[in-house]
């Protein structure tokens, strides 16, 4: 669905509706995803305004959900995008990701499930496949290492404790937190999620490297299996 009958050239928009002018007047945080993307794209096509082009691009990738993981080839194959616009989009996404990692800090202290979710949310909430990640912590609960252990549907027979604890020993970790995403955006834990959690928790108790929590990441939402009583 076209968002509405818009003029084809951005210069023909009413001054108060132009995305760049709105950003300067109100601030970037008050612009929609559509407007921010239109600023990146800069121009539309002969038959479509830049606002409609941005809207169509977001619709193609289910909003921002899949846009982060799109390749240059996938983006440039969309009519009206092309190589230059695809590169601009990917550069902006990567820059945002790097800024987030810098602000999070290399040795982020995790004191709560909210801290853990915040540390991984922007990296994980748009992934199109399940990623099982371990955050290894020192005695001060600082993240000393982050490792993707497995990619694919979570299964207790696939996520082997050996792989998880081998890295823990290598990093001299005092404890760890497991994190995995649900590509659907719904962080409700599955039976397999719970089984994997309990298995790793029991192994951690035997070895002396405590599993502090298992976080399931959705789209701007998360569930702590510790808070749910599974640890």
UniProtKB/Swiss-Prot annotation:
UniProt domain MPN: residue ranges: 109-231
GO biological process: proteolysis
Gene3D superfamilies: 5' to 3' exonuclease, C-terminal subdomain (1.10.150.20), Cytidine Deaminase, domain 2 (3.40.140.10)
Motif (JAMM motif): 180-193
GO MF annotation list: metal ion binding; metallopeptidase activity
Record keywords, A-Z: Hydrolase, Metal-binding, Metalloprotease, Protease, Zinc
Name this polypeptide is given: UPF0758 protein RBAM_025090
């Amino acid at each position: 669905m076209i968002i509405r009958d818009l003029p084809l050239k951005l210069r023909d928009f009413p001054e108060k509706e132009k995305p760049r002018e709105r950003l300067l007047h109100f601030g970037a945080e008050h612009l929609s995803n559509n407007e921010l993307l239109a600023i990146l794209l800069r121009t539309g096509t002969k038959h479509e305004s830049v606002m409609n082009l941005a809207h169509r691009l977001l619709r193609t990738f289910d909003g921002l959900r899949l846009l982060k993981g799109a390749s240059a080839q996938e983006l440039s194959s969309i009519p009206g995008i092309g190589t230059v616009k695809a590169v601009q989009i990917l550069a902006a996404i990567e820059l945002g990701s790097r800024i987030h990692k810098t602000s999070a800090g290399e040795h982020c202290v995790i004191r709560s499930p909210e801290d853990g979710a915040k540390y991984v949310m922007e990296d994980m909430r748009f992934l199109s496949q399940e990623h099982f990640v371990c955050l290894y912590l020192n005695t001060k609960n600082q993240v000393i290492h982050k490792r993707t252990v497995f990619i694919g549907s979570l299964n207790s027979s696939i996520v082997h404790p050996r792989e998880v604890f081998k890295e823990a020993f290598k990093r001299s970790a005092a404890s760890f937190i497991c994190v995995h995403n649900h590509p659907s955006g719904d962080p409700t834990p599955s039976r397999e999620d719970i089984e994997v959690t309990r298995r790793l928790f029991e192994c951690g108790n035997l070895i002396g490297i405590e599993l502090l929590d298992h976080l399931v990441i959705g789209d701007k939402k998360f569930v702590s299996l510790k808070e749910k009583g599974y640890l």
